[in-house]
Amino acid sequence: MKLAFVFRSTPFGRASTREGLDALLAATAFCDEQDIAVFFLDDGVFSLLNHQDPAQILQKDVVNMFKLLDLYDIEQRYICLESLATAKMTASDCIITCEKMARAALLTLLGKAERVLTF
């Protein structure tokens, strides 16, 4: 994998998640899909929590935009099991499917990326 996008912060309250998703989708224009991986850990798992209503806090719906990963054929998607447990979430709570990995294994895989962008 050449390019890793790491989502570590909550999707609302700041623009980093939206900016990260924009960068990820833009990267698909110049990288092969198999060269891009997406990682969700810490509060970044909330970026995938289904049934959120950001209109209640006057925010744009960034969460549903993650469904575009399927359209763009981004298949290397990983989520931290420990972060899911801390957030009291399960994989069925997520808006898209991701490979669930222990934190240590996820960080080992992340270490193989040529470039890492964190949001």
Swiss-Prot record:
Superkingdom of origin organism: Bacteria
Major place of residence = cytoplasm
Write out the entry's keywords from A to Z. Cytoplasm
InterPro entries in UniProt: DsrEFH-like, Sulphur_relay_DsrE/F-like, Sulphur_relay_TusC/DsrF
Instruction: State whether keyword Oxidoreductase applies.
Output: no
Per the record, GO CC terms? cytoplasm
Subcellular location(s) per record: Cytoplasm
Database matches in PANTHER family: PROTEIN TUSC
According to its UniProt entry, what is the function of this protein? Answer: Could be part of a sulfur-relay system.
The record's family statement is: Belongs to the DsrF/TusC family.
| Name this polypeptide is given | Protein TusC homolog
Give the species: Pasteurella multocida (strain Pm70)
